[in-house]
UniProtKB/Swiss-Prot annotation:
It comes from Homo sapiens (Human). Belongs to the melanin-concentrating hormone family. This is Pro-MCH. The gene is PMCH. Predominantly expressed in lateral hypothalamus, also detected in pallidum, neocortex and cerebellum. Also found in thymus, brown adipose tissue, duodenum and testis (spermatogonia, early spermatocytes and Sertoli cells). No expression in peripheral blood. In brain exclusively mature MCH and NEI peptides are present. In peripheral tissues a large product, encompassing the NEI and MCH domains of the precursor, is found predominantly. The modification Isoleucine amide is found at residue 143. Disulfide bonds join 153-162.
């Protein structure tokens, strides 16, 4: 009787392990189908363009170079020289590996990327002071410093009432 229970537990355990592997591979194939559908929707604009035009759509090339393969982002050149790093079903590591050569976000240009280059406008906003009038300390600190002091007071790290900040 004990052997029968033990063999049934082993049978259930092996079935659950194999079913997880099958479900994982099925979910990856479904995810690849969904990704292909998304890429195809962005490529629809290409069909309406002339074939002579060398200019491509802005959205399609940026999305085409990123493909999802075994939970990592690779462009086509890296996909050709990819190596087998072990088991395809790594159940312990579900995170994405870091690949610092690929930048999936767009680089900002001009004053949006570096707001400190705006010069006068930026310095005026940081040097702005609150004008309460009654408090003598209100003109000494910029807004950020006074807000930080108020937060410290509300957290109870300073031994004085909040209205004296």
């Amino acid at each position: 009787m004990a052997k029968m229970n033990l063999s049934s537990y082993i049978l259930i355990l092996t079935f659950s392990l194999f079913s997880q592997g099958i479900l994982l591979s099925a979910s990856k194939s479904i995810r690849n189908l969904d990704d292909d559908m998304v890429f195809n929707t962005f490529r629809l604009g290409k069909g309406f363009q002339k074939e002579d035009t060398a200019e491509k759509s802005v959205i399609a090339p940026s999305l085409e170079q990123y493909k999802n393969d075994e939970s990592s982002f690779m462009n086509e050149e890296e996909n050709k020289v990819s190596k087998n790093t072990g088991s395809k079903h790594n159940f312990l590591n579900h995170g994405l590996p870091l690949n610092l050569a690929i930048k999936p976000y767009l680089a900002l240009k001009g004053s949006v990327a570096f707001p400190a280059e705006n010069g006068v406008q930026n310095t005026e906003s940081t040097q702005e002071k609150r004008e309460i009038g009654d408090e003598e300390n209100s003109a000494k600190f910029p807004i950020g410093r006074r807000d930080f002091d108020m937060l410290r007071c509300m957290l109870g790290r300073v031994y004085r009432p909040c209205w004296q900040v």
